Amino acid sequence: MSTSNAQSGRAAAIARRNAQVKGKGYTASAAPAAPRKPAAPVAEPVVAAAPAPSQPSRSRRKVSVAPTATPAASAAGREAAKLKRQQQKNGKSSAGAANAMPHPKAKAKQKPEEPIVEPRQAKAEKPTKRSERRTGVKPQVASQQPSGRLQSKAYRKAQAKGKAGQEAFKSNGSSQSGAKAKLANPDASTREIAQQVRAERCAQGKTCSTGGSRPMRKRRNAKEAPQKVGESQTLHGQSVSGTQVGQGEKKMTGSESGACQLVSGTEYLGAEEFSKNCDVQPTPQPAKVTQTQTTRGQVVSGSTKVGRSDKMTGNETGTCSAITGTEYLPADQSKMYCGETPAKSKATGFSVMSQATQKSEQKVTGGDSRKSQSTTFKPKNPASAPHKVMPSQTAKGNTTTGSQVGRLESVTGGERGSCHAVTGTGYQGAEEAKACDMPMTETADKVTASGTAGGQKVTGDRSGAYYGMTGAEAGDCKTITGTSYTGTEQFQFCSVDEQNEMKVRQRKGANPSISGVQPGPQGLTGAQKGACELVTGSHYQGGDQTAMVCDSTNAAAPGESDFPAMIGQAQPAFSTNEVEPMVDEGSKITGDGWDRGSKVTGTDGPWAAQRNASIRGVAGQSPMGASQYRPVNNEVPMSPITGSSGNTDTGAKVTLSGGARA
């Protein structure tokens, strides 16, 4: 066998393996095929006579190939495989470019063989190469593959990509028309694939159904199932929805007892129950909830019908009389029993509601009879109701809130004692005095406040002629040396001399008075030193003495610019003495290390003295305890009243300072 035959067999084996791996739709395009003639049919060599199939083998034996073509052919096969993989990776554009510019070594192999003229054929046509015939036939075979096989190939291809490929395969649908079209013709463009998918969907639908359905036998006696939720109307015309109860179509037994009887409670049977199963349709019971309309069109609903009725006696009184409050009687009552329509009362407000019985203009969907609109109109100037909580002011200016008491224009029955003053807490407002046309009587203050001569505020019950209290005039105009509790308003009942004396004897300022022998620079030698300097303790020098010795008129006061001030802002340093121990060191405690060592603390106190009472030291401490203070008695005071000046065991019972001896 020649080298060319071996190489062509090897190329055919490689192409066959590639077709098995990638499907029958794979096209062996390792080398660009030579252009065909349009008139040359592909199937012409197949129709030839019997000796025709052996003709190509003779032509291969006759053709001589140089020995140097074997490595070039193997390299061309590898290059063709690389080009094919590159085409599948890049798409159609790279495939077209690869076909346009084939490898130089591949061109050497693509030299057309010389045709052999057959004697039995009328026309000698140039036979095509084996690769060309294989290229032209394979797309036809691939197009004839069943859709199930292409579907399986597409699924295996997606499964080879992993989980992501499987999810993409499932999300794209079960038909996978695009994947099958790509497997059938790998060189097809996206436009051609889309056209094939649309054509397949037009022919078979999106679910790839063939259009033929399996014959199904029609069920015998097929009847509709009863409705789960039914709707009917009672004898009163009310809608009832839900599971229908009753005899129905004679499918339920045991419900014949009381089928044509009425119930006294809520009506739940439909009107068709009586029309189908009963000979006579009963009269419905009175409605549980009734609705009536007033003369102004307002709807009144409730379980009890108000007004006069033929079945109710005892309510004839006031049938034809009008009411001033809310109108609740029906409009037809006056026509039935009075023979005339009563006059409409003055409207203070009215509402417009759509009725439940309106069918044509009902705005509510779903079949429920609920109101669809509720609008309330109120007049512009409604009658003002009295305030529940109203503020007012008494004669003393105190504010009171709450329900107003007393005589008012809108309150009747409170005339007795309305214009009289009360002696207790004043709660009557100014509007009551206005109604009585008289000034308000001011009552006495329950708690008074006044000021003393020293500027202090005193509150509470006051005594004296000013406050209308008798028996407390003694000592009102006397000057006291203790705490002042009498207000300045009491001075107007004293004479001028008594007032002047009170002013002279009244202590002024916060400096205490100094009595006795006053030391000072007057008549005492050696006392001038430091007489004009400030002291930090108690003042013992009077102001007149200081003015006589020192020039106090020109002296600088604290806060002035020439007042001496400390230049440095450093804190004053204080000398501290060395701290001495309060308890002298005694003898050490014998025993288990109870000494004044560095490792044991707290053994020099009363606990150590209790353990060893014979060794107490120079100034031993006695143990603390409440039992030591038992023999000590508290000092009995002279009087149980404290905090007052002049508290002595002898003297008058009552002093001017306010202190009393019990």
From Swiss-Prot:
TM region(s), chain numbering: none
Leader peptide range in chain numbering: none
Polar residues composition-biased segments: 141-150, 391-404, 641-650
Modification note: Unlike H.neapolitanus and predictions for P.marinus strain MIT 9313, this protein is not thought to have ribosomal frameshifting.
Region called N-terminal domain, residue ranges: 1-227
Note on domains (UniProt): Has 3 domains; the N-terminal domain has 3 short repeats and binds RuBisCO. The central region has 5 longer repeats. The C-terminal domain has 1 repeat (compared to orthologs) and a highly conserved C-terminal peptide. The C-repeat serves as the encapsulation signal for the alpha-carboxysome, and is able to target foreign proteins to this organelle.
Compositional bias of kind Basic and acidic residues: 120-135
Chain residue ranges for the region called C-terminal peptide: 632-662
Swiss-Prot/TrEMBL M-repeat repeat ranges: 228-278, 288-338, 388-436, 446-491, 496-550
Induction of the gene: Induced by growth in low levels of dissolved inorganic carbon (at protein level).
Keywords in alphabetical order: Bacterial microcompartment, Carbon dioxide fixation, Carboxysome, Repeat
Organism in which the protein naturally occurs: Hydrogenovibrio crunogenus (strain DSM 25203 / XCL-2) (Thiomicrospira crunogena)
Protein name (Swiss-Prot/TrEMBL): Carboxysome assembly protein CsoS2
Family per similarity comment: Belongs to the CsoS2 family.
Gene Ontology terms, MF aspect: structural constituent of carboxysome shell
Function: Required for alpha-carboxysome (Cb) assembly, mediates interaction between RuBisCO and the Cb shell. The protein is probably intrinsically disordered. The C-terminal repeats act as the encapsulation signal to target proteins to the Cb; they are necessary and sufficient to target both CsoS2 and foreign proteins to the Cb. The N-terminal repeats of this protein bind simultaneously to both subunits of RuBisCO.
